Amino acid sequence: LHTKGSVPLDTITFYKVIPKHKFVLVKFDTQY
């Protein structure tokens, strides 16, 4: 899981892959 290097890319991918799990994105943002 490379979230420290692919934060913006992961965000877009997450939005397209898991648009219903917006809370997951928030959690990733908090960790970042």
Swiss-Prot record:
InterPro entries on file: ERp29_N
Compartment list: Endoplasmic reticulum lumen; Melanosome
GO cellular component, one term: endoplasmic reticulum lumen
UniProt KW Endoplasmic reticulum keyword: yes
Residues the record lists as Phosphotyrosine modifications: Y32
Transcription recorded as keyword: no
GO biological process, one term: protein secretion
Subunit structure: Homodimer. Part of a large chaperone multiprotein complex comprising CABP1, DNAJB11, HSP90B1, HSPA5, HYOU, PDIA2, PDIA4, PPIB, SDF2L1, UGGT1 and very small amounts of ERP29, but not, or at very low levels, CALR nor CANX.
Protein name: Endoplasmic reticulum resident protein 29
Originating species: Trichosurus vulpecula
Source organism phylogeny: Eukaryota, Metazoa, Chordata, Craniata, Vertebrata
Gene label: ERP29
